[in-house]
């Protein structure tokens, strides 16, 4: 399954039916209490349970039928995503679909993580100083929930390797809980191994690195790979690394 599969209305139809199994979670919740689903399944389940005010907060900017919860208000982050959902672009192959009702879509703007916002002034000042002082520019690559970006990662890493070697760039690679992606990258680009430090399934080590990277006295070089078996750690790792990266 890839993003084209998740894009199909037929995939969503099966998901909406399966979500009936989760409706009992809302059985004892008053039906006029607002519900915000940060994934489509709880939003779909809330609709099945008869909740009256359901917001489906869509995290992806690639319009996919996977994220549709019929009967809820869908919040969208960017204009092109809004238009893609409005016309259900490509969700029924080449057929032109009836548009979603205008009142079921709301353009909200970008969702920004607390960690990025709370230190934004100090962190941006540190970014400027790194640039002025000729420090390596720090790039952060993060895998998505489906683990489907390996080819894109490989192309970026191949391009950056000469700059990493010259200490003009440094790279964080968070493969989430997909260790197979890291292994595939190493297999495809064996030369990256000599620059790589692996921070694997050790949350304390990850926290310590993220803290160290914020210290301007510390030199961050090479490639730092992050993988965690625990899904929360796999995702939240990115929140910690964002503050010290440049791109």
Protein language model features and the residues they cover:
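A nucleotide-sugar donor-handling region in carbohydrate enzymes
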Residues: 71-158, 174-183
């Amino acid at each position: 399954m890839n993003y084209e599969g998740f894009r199909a209305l037929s995939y969503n139809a099966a998901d909406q039916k399966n979500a009936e199994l989760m409706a009992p979670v809302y059985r004892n919740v008053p039906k006029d209490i607002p519900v915000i689903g940060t994934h489509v399944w709880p939003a779909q389940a809330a609709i099945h349970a008869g909740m009256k005010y359901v917001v489906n907060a869509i995290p992806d900017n690639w319009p996919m039928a996977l994220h549709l919860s019929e009967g809820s208000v869908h919040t969208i982050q960017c204009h092109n995503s809004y238009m893609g959902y409005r016309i259900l672009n490509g969700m029924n192959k080449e057929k032109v679909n009836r548009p979603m009702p205008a009142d079921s879509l709301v353009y909200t703007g970008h969702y920004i993580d607390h960690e990025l916002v709370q230190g934004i002034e100090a962190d941006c000042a540190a970014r400027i100083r790194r640039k002025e002082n000729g420090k390596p520019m720090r790039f952060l690559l993060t895998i998505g929930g489906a683990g489907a970006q390996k080819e894109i990662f490989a192309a970026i890493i191949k391009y950056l390797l000469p700059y990493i070697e010259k200490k003009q760039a440094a790279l964080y690679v968070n493969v989430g809980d997909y260790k197979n992606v890291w292994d595939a990258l190493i297999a495809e680009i064996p030369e990256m191994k000599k620059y790589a430090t692996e921070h694997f399934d050790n949350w304390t080590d990850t926290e310590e690195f993220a803290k160290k990277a914020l210290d301007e006295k510390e030199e961050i070089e090479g490639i730092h790979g992050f993988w965690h078996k625990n899904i929360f750690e796999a995702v939240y790792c990115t929140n910690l690394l964002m503050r010290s990266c440049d791109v």
